[in-house]
Amino acid sequence: MPQPALSDQDNAISRTLVGARLSAEPLPDFPIQLPTSLEQAYAIQSASIERWPDELVGWKVAMLSPAEQQRFKAQRLVGPVFRSSFHTVEAGSSIVMPVYRDGFAAVEAEIVFVLGETIPPTGRDYSDAELASFIATVSAGAEIASSPMKVINDLGAMSVISDFGNNAGVIAGPAVPNWATQKPGFLTATVTVDDATVGSK
């Protein structure tokens, strides 16, 4: 979406959010003032992506709450995934992922799509078949949601979008064979803790 020129205040918000992540220092609250629009929040996010010393390789996508969908006229939000925090694991293996001490941390079940080519932006919606043609692999996975700001989710979508979508990493499992011939919804990702399922998608 078109983004406004970044104000001095929003530039300061971006610097503070990025600085907290780089230093792993907790933030007690959102810095300065919450954005009031999607355009403002994504402008802050874009500035932070430019500041971040890593390569952008993908996006996490999350659903907005029903109230926020109505308020902002959008269904989903996105946040960046960077190369150093994207990992693939083989079946039966494990990986240790860092989170922000004294901040927010969660593990969320995800379905991970790895694209074989970039999807060109257009002025129309792509069909499901067209979108599927861009996908190289599909796998069950997990998102490490973490931020130096413990209250990031409590403050809502404007806070989450501004701070990298509350993303700190993505783990992709083995690629699912023959995924393109399966019916929608054939794959379920689950998160278990001590053999108890705590989340699924």
List PLM regions with ranges.
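Catalytic-core "active-site belt" of small-molecule-metabolizing enzymes
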Residues: 2-201
